[in-house]
Amino acid sequence: MTILVDMDGVICTEEKTFERALAKPMPGAREALAALKAKGHTLIIYSARTWSELRMTEAWLKQHDIPYDGIHLGKPVADRILDDRAVRFTGWDAALKDLG
């Protein structure tokens, strides 16, 4: 299964644009993503960050040992997203349960 994973507020804490390199990993993020990879899932980071933040984002992911298979930046910003395949993120324990 291919899983799109948001960056800010899911993998790491929400920070202002120019402070994103200082973000902290969300509790359980690395372990949960590693467990999903171990089950054979493909993990794509899907974020509203801009492409100019790509190198910084890749460096942050490497520094915090976050597994992923690809990155897609420039997700449209909206007040709400309607999607028939979405899982509302409330924490990594619940996300792992929802994803099976």
Language-model features, listed with the residues they occupy:
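HAD-like aspartate-dependent phosphatase fold
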Residues: 1-100
